[in-house]
């Protein structure tokens, strides 16, 4: 029998799981196979779990090497060939993470005050303005 070329066909819409189950039902060798349903948590459950996890820990949230590269890149603007002790970079990282966490706490309070649960740039601007920081 001669081989023939097959042309590409578009699939007709519909749920992929229903099409798979129909194919399995038609085939002879897979009579009693059930598709396992993917487990999903309710929206917000994983977020709350992450919040609890990070509130318990005292670890740094930003990775050390990317932060170190950022510090060196910013220092190049002021003076070239600057060298940093490891403890100096660690102190900068501790201070910057503390600042960011406090800023996000204040930002979250601003969003809650506006009867929202999602923070927006205007919340950050308001938090910084209340703190008395300069906004560029």
From Swiss-Prot:
It is found in: Nucleomorph; Chromosome. One of its GO terms (molecular function) is DNA binding. The keyword Nuclease does not apply. It comes from the Eukaryota. Gene3D superfamilies: Histone, subunit A (1.10.20.10). Its main location: other. Keywords: Chromosome, DNA-binding, Nucleomorph, Nucleosome core. Pfam families: Histone. Transmembrane segments: none annotated. Signal peptide: none annotated. GO terms for cellular component: nucleosome. PANTHER family: HISTONE H3. Belongs to the histone H3 family. Core component of nucleosome. Nucleosomes wrap and compact DNA into chromatin, limiting DNA accessibility to the cellular machineries which require DNA as a template. Histones thereby play a central role in transcription regulation, DNA repair, DNA replication and chromosomal stability. DNA accessibility is regulated via a complex set of post-translational modifications of histones, also called histone code, and nucleosome remodeling. The nucleosome is a histone octamer containing two molecules each of H2A, H2B, H3 and H4 assembled in one H3-H4 heterotetramer and two H2A-H2B heterodimers. The octamer wraps approximately 147 bp of DNA. This is Histone H3. It comes from Guillardia theta (Cryptophyte).
């Amino acid at each position: 029998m001669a081989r023939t070329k097959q042309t590409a066909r578009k699939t007709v819409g519909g749920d992929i799981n229903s099409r798979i189950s129909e194919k399995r039902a038609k085939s002879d060798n897979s009579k009693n196979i059930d598709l396992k349903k993917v487990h999903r948590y309710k929206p917000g459950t994983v977020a709350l779990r992450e919040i609890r996890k990070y509130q318990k820990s005292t670890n740094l949230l930003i990775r050390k090497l990317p932060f170190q590269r950022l510090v060196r890149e910013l220092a190049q603007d002021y003076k070239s060939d600057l060298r940093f002790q490891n403890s100096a970079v660690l102190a900068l990282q501790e201070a910057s993470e503390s600042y960011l966490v406090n800023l996000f706490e204040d930002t979250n309070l601003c969003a809650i005050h506006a009867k929202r649960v999602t923070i927006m740039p205007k919340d950050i601007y308001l938090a910084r303005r209340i703190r008395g920081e300069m906004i560029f």
